[in-house]
């Protein structure tokens, strides 16, 4: 048996079991502050082209206690081959010796830490627990968010709007076991009672065009390139803006880039968490993700594994 074969490697289901949403949110809270303080190294991701329009994404990160490296391949042609579009893993390392400790499923880490960052933003920006949350989108990101928001805000009603007739109802039926409060939105109009909207699509053009309004937090998740925007530019311009990672947002937050925002007026999630941002007016939280959030997932998994061994 080689040293590599003794390293624990967890599949998607096992990775999800190690990343309990409330625990992941708590770890992210500390990790966001450390990253903002310069205590975590998280460089811009490296993108390497593959054949057929695919890309290989390398996202390393390092802190005093742990280092991580996410290596993910995105291959659009895999759908026709009956293979997943996204494949990869996140490796965790001892930050002093460099020894590999364990390996997690990459897409599962990405999905769960993305949903947890959304939940942290809602918790930090909305103030009181939300009552009615609208998810726009019915794909994998929406599924992760439904589970996360149900776990962290169990009393909130979760409404879903899809891009096709019947897609929201089918989504709710498929995921109600994980999120009992799921219900399809009745019609296209967004009720005034909705106090949080989360956009979770692959659309390159706006799927949310409502005017910016006090009392409603809009969270943009789906758009991840400079020329894609899920949220209308006027909505963005008339909102007070917060991003999870200011460095990455300048290159990847298409909703803000298309709207040509003044980056001097864009706050960070770390600013909100340390009380340096006034939570008033129409609010918009844009997430782009970064390797430091993968590190937070590895910390959460490490703690869960330690608890299992101790038990």
From Swiss-Prot:
A matching Pfam family: OCD_Mu_crystall
InterPro entries, sorted: NAD(P)-bd_dom_sf, ODC_Mu_crystall, ODC_N, Pyr2C_reductase-like
Entry's Gene Ontology molecular function annotations: hormone binding; oxidoreductase activity
Keyword Oxidoreductase: yes
Keywords in alphabetical order: NAD, NADP, Oxidoreductase
Known catalytic reactions: L-proline + NAD(+) = 1-pyrroline-2-carboxylate + NADH + H(+); L-proline + NADP(+) = 1-pyrroline-2-carboxylate + NADPH + H(+)
Any single GO CC term annotated in Swiss-Prot or TrEMBL for this entry: cytoplasm
EC number(s) reported in the record: 1.5.1.49
Gene3D superfamilies: NAD(P)-binding Rossmann-like Domain, ornithine cyclodeaminase, domain 1
Function: Catalyzes the reduction of Delta(1)-pyrroline-2-carboxylate (Pyr2C) to L-proline, using preferentially NADPH over NADH as the electron donor. May be involved in a degradation pathway that converts trans-3-hydroxy-L-proline (t3LHyp) to L-proline.
Similarity-based family: Belongs to the ornithine cyclodeaminase/mu-crystallin family.
Protein name per Swiss-Prot or TrEMBL: Delta(1)-pyrroline-2-carboxylate reductase 2
Organism, as annotated: Burkholderia ambifaria (strain ATCC BAA-244 / DSM 16087 / CCUG 44356 / LMG 19182 / AMMD) (Burkholderia cepacia (strain AMMD))
